[in-house]
Amino acid sequence: MHEMQKTRPWAILAAGAAIQVLTGLPAAWGVFQRPVMEEYGLSEQGAGYAFGVLIAFFGIGCVIGGFLQDKHGPRFAALWGTGLLCGGFFAAAALPAEKGSAFFGVFSIPAGLGTAFLYPSIQSCAQKWYKGRKGLATGVIGGAVGLSGAFLTVFVRTALRGFGPVQGIRGAFWALGAITLPVCLAGSLLLQDPPESRQNQQGSGKNEIDLSPWQMLKTKQYWLCAGAVCFSTPAVLLFSPITVSYTHLTLPTNSL
């Protein structure tokens, strides 16, 4: 038991990083936009709505996922997130081209919620195991989120060129679902909060504050953090599709 407790923090950090590398959809949407428009018959405005719905449900899911992991533990929230995210990938791959208007419901909503359920469960669990080194835990998980955009961009562009059975955006969705399911499932099963004795020991001698959500909303620190995130996030999320379109990172139609 003692050996497991010594190795579990690193296992949880590694599992969380592996999951996050596969779940950076909001930051990587630019590489999906043009192929999704062409395959499902969506206009540029329609593809923008698909992205907007994804982001909206990512935000909603972060709140719901946070409450789920607080009440039922990180494993519970992460397993639900895995099911929703993989379900979104598989549903998008199977969606008939003439039913493109359903793309929002079969992909944007479950993928947004699934990605969001995974994020707080991983981040919170890692920080609890690394109470004295929260910066390390946050940095590793955050770095994996950054790498996710690069990984998904390369993966989708390769799928659009075609390799083996993976052909086009549908093949990319099938393959992402097939890869994400075992990785996120195995990683989610490893997530577990540390024993209470460990938390108490690491927190001893420190004045820790545990506020309710309503108390948190009344603090200046919360609104400063929220404002910083609100002003910094658009650079990644809103400009991603525009940047990809204007730098021709997506492939032209005749090359698919």
Give, region by region, the residue ranges found by the protein language model:
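Helix-loop-helix hairpin linking two adjacent transmembrane segments in secondary transporters
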Residues: 145-192
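Flexible cytoplasmic inter-helical loops of multi-pass small-molecule transporters
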Residues: 193-211
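Single conserved hydrophobic/aromatic residue that forms the stacking wall/gate
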Residues: 248-256
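C-terminal ends and interior cores of transmembrane alpha-helices
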Residues: 84-97
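Extracytoplasmic gate region of multi-pass secondary transporters
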Residues: 29-33, 220-249
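Helix-to-loop junctions at the C-terminal end of transmembrane segments
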Residues: 62-73
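Intracellular juxtamembrane helix-capping segments at the cytosolic ends
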Residues: 117-130
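Hydrophobic core of transmembrane alpha-helices in multi-pass small-molecule transporters
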Residues: 102-116
